[in-house]
């Protein structure tokens, strides 16, 4: 398993809505994540800065990255774009993080 971490950014005032939307994550989106090898996926929020920290374990990063090509993922991005910083294709603005420590 590969460990993948990134940060994303909420627009101010959207903490509750972001949590609500993820509490109600579409079953099709859950299935797509799992089908692309995602496991142990967590997202944390720094409430002072509206910064999100995402962590996911993936079987193969190249396979996981292909989720971006799916219709359900693109629909999810469009749904989330009004409440978080997004790219022109509606994907969230994300900064991949480099792992600097790991304790097994």
From Swiss-Prot:
Belongs to the rhamnose mutarotase family. Substrate binds at residues 18, 41, 76-77. This is L-rhamnose mutarotase. GO terms for molecular function: L-rhamnose mutarotase activity; racemase and epimerase activity, acting on carbohydrates and derivatives. It holds the Pfam family rhaM. Involved in the anomeric conversion of L-rhamnose. Coiled coil: none annotated. Homodimer. One of its GO terms (cellular component) is cytoplasm. It catalyses: alpha-L-rhamnose = beta-L-rhamnose. Pathway: Carbohydrate metabolism; L-rhamnose metabolism. HAMAP family: L_rham_rotase. It is found in: Cytoplasm. Its EC number is 5.1.3.32. It comes from the Bacteria.
């Amino acid at each position: 398993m590969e460990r993948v971490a990134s940060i994303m950014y909420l627009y101010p005032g959207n903490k509750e809505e972001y949590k609500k939307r993820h509490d109600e994550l579409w079953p099709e989106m859950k299935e797509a994540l799992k089908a692309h090898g995602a496991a142990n996926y967590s997202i944390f929020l720094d409430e002072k800065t509206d910064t999100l920290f995402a962590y996911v374990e993936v079987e193969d990063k190249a396979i996981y990255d292909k989720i971006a090509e799916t219709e359900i993922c693109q629909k999810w991005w469009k749904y989330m774009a009004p409440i978080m910083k997004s790219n022109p294709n509606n994907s969230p603005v994300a900064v991949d993080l480099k792992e600097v420590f790991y304790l097994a």
